[in-house]
Amino acid sequence: MATQTRGYTATKHQLLERLAKIEGQVRGVAKIVEDDRYCIDVVTQINAVRAALDKVGLGLLDGHVRHCLIGGHGGPTDPDEQAQELMGAVGRMVSR
């Protein structure tokens, strides 16, 4: 059985490393809450985690556009459906 490639397949190792770092950041947020640190310190760390996740998400979207849409490797083939799928993903990222 052939392995299916995704837009992130070539950088999967780096992606997993980044996600592991983000996981560590989240554990760090829990630790500073346990330590009763100043509220603004907690919020600052939460914002750092969100920024890191946003960066990962944007990288995944970039890979999706280049590999899946432009390269024609999966997803819808109709340009209108492609645009709708992409804009839906972007909308979910920015509407928190």
Regions found by a protein language model. Name each.
Residues 1-96:
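Solvent-exposed interaction patches of small proteins and small membrane subunits
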